[in-house]
Amino acid sequence: MNIALGQSALFLGLLGALAGAGSLLVGLSSGRRSLLRAGQGYIWLVALGAVLATVAMQRALITHDFTLVYVDNNDSTFTPLIYRITAMWSDLAGSILLWALVLSGYLMAMWIRFRKRAYDPVVVWAKVTGYVIAAFFFGLMLTLSDPFTRVHGAVPTQGPGPNPLLQDRVLVAFHPPLLYLGLVGFTVPFCFAVASLVTGQVGQGWLFETRRWSIFAWTCLTAGVVLGAWWSYQVLGWSGYWAWDPVENSALLPWLTATAFLHSAMVQQRRAMLRVWNISLILSTFSLTILGTFFTRSGVLESVHSFTDDGGVGPTLLVFFGLVVAICIGLLVWRGDQLRTQGAIESPLSREGALLANNLLFGAFAFVVLLGTVFPLLVQALNGSSITVGGPFFDTMTMPIVLCLLFLMAVAPVLPWRRASGELLRQRLAWPAAAAAGVLAACVLAGLRGFWPLLVFTLAAFAGTSALRQLVVLVRRVGPRSIAGRSGGGMIVHLGVVLVAVGFAASHAYQHQALLTMSVGKPASFQGHTLVFRGTKTVTSSGRSSLIATVDVDGHAYYPAIEQFALSNQAVVSPAVHSTPAQDIYLALTSVPTAADPAAGVAVYATPLVMWLWVGGLVVVLGALLSLWPSGRPRAGPAEERSRGHGVEPHDSYGSVGTGEQETADLPEPGKTGVGAAV
């Protein structure tokens, strides 16, 4: 039943996507409104197909239906219910099914949002693009990566279960879905960008329609990346959280281009400039999600996160990526004349100048990450050699970019549009500069050393104080409710980024570690802490056996463990972590006591300020959610204002708060907040 239901549902989804795209295309070419109306309704078939296929897969996993190859490979009778549910996205075919489910949800939301604009060419072409993308993924599942393939021969009675690493924390129930909500979410802005190019309507319309979709997707992707780092820290036993792994980079790349887009969009909204930048960034963001999907699902790059592909999915994804890039470039060339604008940046010391620099920096960051990720593939393709590009390359190349971005985070929000005077900058940056100098002095007096971390702390104080200043003045001028809006939310995002930067710098520069051989009852010293090994015990539960050590650290008990799953040969290290705002103590077993050697090997790490990474990530997500909150009536772009005869540019609230006449002029009316970009 599960196989029949699942495969029928996939066919229904593919049929709905093809019929919807065909109906809309014929309706556009013939001008028949009945076909345009009918074309909208096929989204129900796409969504129904994705939902029914998901129900069939979940039913198969929950009931241990080992007639499915997917269940046989990823389930066992010992697997707890929560991990049976999450097993749907623990392997290749199921992860593509999750992608199709999330995509159909976004397409349904797009249909609901724009249902009253059934005859708008931009909306119609956006839906056609969405249908084509959905058809590709449903077709992929029906051909090369069928999650409902039947087991040939005797039906097994037991499977190996999910990867043991995916059965250690319930974070696996949230981390991948959030990543997919983020990555797949950029499909909607991509569809509208393509539609605007096809129709030639490349002005402000597509940007206005997709702003909230972009921020929501960016928020989910940010939350997914942060949770992924937390999972790595809590589960893998290496005390790290970011290894520049190819799959980690695959999520980071679209995040970088999307962040650049959200900033750059403000310039087009305010000055009708950077059209090529904005549409290229959103096209690049979607293209990079497809490239990342190829990296993850092709097996060409080694990663603890990647899937094994033995059915041709990787080459198909690569061809799809190539087609997407070729079509995007072709559309940009075709509409190049219409995308060019007459406006020019009058001064580098202006908000648009700073945001253009921001684009260049994020672009450079993305290029470095992409180069380091694909370089081993290029070398292998050229001469057959196998090389790796590790953390030192990425750290060395990206650190200067991060420092420049921190500086821009402080300066850009206080800059006015068009040009700024030196006196204005001195006035608005006096307190942030003083705070930065104070933090640097305090760090030196506290005995902290190291050029890079001290520079990060200084610039973080500069940027953080600038964001706080903006928030304070905004609340004074507009009222407390202005926090829940685009300007307030954007500054809260900046505060979160500052916390992440501080946590990252401190945890990298000042971490201490040691590998201790500990006998029962004998104390050991580490960085001013006293550790005492109290012994081990074995705890057996359904399908797993855990050898748990007890180690006292300054009188507090820690319980690092090594877990062995009954149906897997892989032993999993389960670290013990005690977090405080100042420092984390992290313990991981490296060897267990035996009759011949009763001592235990314990890796111990003291990592300062790492908690602020997670706090900062939470603040970033909170700020992004606040920026989605309705913040007053929308303001028109410059072209719309001029068409009404006002000749006055609209307000953009991002960073336009402070003291002085020019800042006051930027503020919205009392009781209203502005409509600048959120991040």
Language-model features: locations:
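Membrane-interface interhelical loops and short amphipathic "cap" helices
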Residues: 1-9, 32-36, 59-93, 146-176, ...
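Contiguous transmembrane helix-bundle modules in multi-pass membrane proteins
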Residues: 1-33, 45-48, 52, 66, ...
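A conserved hydrophobic secondary-structure block that centers on an alpha-helix together
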Residues: 11-22, 28, 95-229
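Membrane-interfacial helix termini and the short, flexible loops that connect transmembrane helices
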Residues: 22-39, 66-70, 102-126, 193-210, ...
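A generic, lipid-embedded transmembrane alpha helix
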Residues: 45-62, 220-227, 496
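Transmembrane-helix bundle segments that line or gate the permeation/cavity pathway
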Residues: 50-73, 77-79, 86-111, 140-150, ...
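Extended, hydrophobic alpha-helical segments in both membrane/secreted and soluble proteins
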Residues: 173-177, 184-194, 206-263, 277, ...
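Soluble non-transmembrane domains of integral membrane proteins
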Residues: 516-600
